[in-house]
Amino acid sequence: MSENSIRLTQYSHGAGCGCKISPKVLETILHSEQAKFVDPNLLVGNETRDDAAVYDLGNGTSVISTTDFFMPIVDNPFDFGRIAATNAISDIFAMGGKPIMAIAILGWPINKLSPEIAREVTEGGRYACRQAGIALAGGHSIDATEPIFGLAVTGIVPTERVKKNSTAQAGCKLFLTKPLGIGVLTTAEKKSLLKPEHQGLATEVMCRMNIAGASFANIEGVKAMTDVTGFGLLGHLSEMCQGAGVQARVDYDAIPKLPGVEEYIKLGAVPGGTERNFASYGHLMGEMPREVRDLLCDPQTSGGLLLAVMPEAENEVKATAAEFGIELTAIGELVPARGGRAMVEIR
């Protein structure tokens, strides 16, 4: 079988960040007193569900450490590697940092898929690393039943510029740097529903590097930042609200969306991860139509950055975004928490 005819998505039961373990199950796995390692230099662990761990070196600089890997979300091997690497590196940018090196994580069904295809995957990962200005310095591989690829990435950040979920504040405006609908469009493609004019749109968005995060972190009024991935906008926004003790009001019409996404939702192109996300976070939402819920819970792979920005910094944030070719519009705001009200209200 040639590399051009291979369909990687047929060799896995999940796709991209949609194959994450559900938040409910993950909570059970992580719920342990022994998981609460006490080290005053560990600035960010897993308590607030942030994108990466952060360790203070004591000299004004902190180290960021993260890992991310998944099964194919596209059929093209090079694109799969590039997307997986871009997604992993994004965690460093979401914490306000600069990546400095990466190592690869590869699981490969050697009796089903040739090593030449695995090489294409790793070349895609290496390409993304070059885009981020870092080396793919090594890695580890295993014989697996399904193809898996990703990175463990190390970065650095000025300690005072670390961006965490828990540092969001009431009064902040919310901005999203990429459109939603990646899970929907990739599912539509698998179901042969995707229109010719929408071919390649999701791949282009997934390959777009969140490199602007390091520049956003230098803006005083950017209070919190996270990337929107497998738990969808609802999940990652809810975790920001829970960490900071605030609530969110979101303007649905202002949310950037991939072309055709609402039509594909009506046609049933909804990934399985959407239901898992709703089962974990749905109780935090107000009432809304099913199609709105399906978009907000849509698992994103290599999604955009979600920023919480004080109003006085809005113009500076938009100007910085424009330098990276990003057009920003506020999608909502954070407000003080009040009992009896949904954590995330959709208007």
Curated annotation (Swiss-Prot):
Pfam families: AIRS, AIRS_C. ATP binds at K20, T48, R49, D50, D68, D91, G139, H140, S141. Keywords: ATP-binding, Kinase, Magnesium, Metal-binding, Nucleotide-binding, Selenium, Transferase. Its cofactor is Mg(2+). Binds 1 Mg(2+) ion per monomer. The active site is at C17. Disulfide bonds: none annotated. Synthesizes selenophosphate from selenide and ATP. GO terms for molecular function: ATP binding; magnesium ion binding; selenide, water dikinase activity. It comes from the Bacteria. GO terms for biological process: selenocysteine biosynthetic process. Belongs to the selenophosphate synthase 1 family. Class I subfamily. Its EC number is 2.7.9.3. NCBIfam families: PRK00943.1, selD. Homodimer. Mg(2+) binds at D51, D91, D227. It comes from Shigella sonnei (strain Ss046). InterPro entries: PurM-like_C_dom (IPR010918), PurM-like_C_sf (IPR036676), PurM-like_N (IPR016188), PurM-like_N_sf (IPR036921), SelD_I (IPR023061), SPS/SelD (IPR004536). This is Selenide, water dikinase. The gene is selD.
